[in-house]
Amino acid sequence: MLTDNLSAQEENKETLAQHAAMDFTTGIGWNADNQLYRPASDHEGSLDSFLKPAAFETQRLFENDRFPNVIVAMDGTVLAAWNGVAIRRSSDGGKTWDTAQVIAEGFMSGGFVVDEVSGDIFAFIEAGHPPAPLYIYRSADHGITWNKQDTIVFPNSFGHVPTMHMNEHGISLRHGRFKGRLISACRWYGRSNYPVENFHTHYTNALFSDDGGRTWKASEPFPVMGTGEACIVELSDGRLYYNTRRHWAPLAEDALWRWSGYSEDGGMTWTNPRRSSVLPDGDVATTYGLMGGLVRLPVLGRDILLYSNIVSQSGRRNGHVWASFDGGETWPLRRQVYAGNFAYSSLNAGRPGTPSEGWIYLLYEGGEETGGSFSRFNLTWLLQGEKTGNGSLPGWITP
């Protein structure tokens, strides 16, 4: 079910606090900037749930087309988003799936965001291949129905209003001063998407909201040009870790590997950019790069990050998942997911106390046939992968 405007229930909400109280009766707080939040302990649990007997499953969810995002609603419903713009829902942790539902006709923008205060989900949809008008749809029932809301996006200091096209899903912040903020990676196309000579005018950044998704602000640029299609996770100390594709660089080799950086102000600015020496950015025989997935497992007090991309010098194939146990400083482990066709991908993880608990989710372009394939696995399975030589496993995780 779709409507052109917000539902009557949404229009009559007097405050975000009122909305939150309708869905959650305890645990709501206010941060230093008077933003609503729920404590991290409501969303993060123990490591044990991810360390059950090794499990790995794959199934095909979509025929043809492309552009993945996978998110997990507050009740544990897994939503696989695809192309222009369809979703499939799973209420049993990713085992079985409802038939596909079209949110709206348009172009998949990536950047789906779950508001962990209200439980609402935001979908960003563009009228065509960006740059193009951006529309925001909101679901207040874990992705069953969707309503179009006003799109209010404020530019950054350069006057740029970015596009959301094919970034990884966004997140709700749980730690530090800005807990309660919604944030998602986005991008600025500069002069234009093509020709290639314009790539150096591109950059990535972020959109964030401090009022429950009613309005959004564009952050300052990630300080590396030629970037596009990025991911953001929050570390347990409140810093944000940023990881991005780069399809142009003055030195060609700098576009073969992922670039990362950090934010200490909730995603308004980005610092300490550096090139990875272990995380590839697509086929390393080219400088074009490849969208990858990124997630921090919801484990209290641990910064376990997972990243998805390919290990290839001959096209988009041979998908892998990498693991970091120190917030992205080192990536000592990887495991192959699929040896054949593998392109854009999105990662997420299950929520404690729901049917999704303990599962890691990967939606990617490729598989045995064209379209979208979905894998679910646990950390035990991933720990049986190969060592990269980049750091070592900590004692608390060594199998």
What residue ranges belong to the model's regions?
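C-terminal segment of classical bacterial N-terminal signal peptides
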Residues: 1-5
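Asp-box/BNR beta-propeller blade signature and adjacent active/binding-site loops
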Residues: 10-399
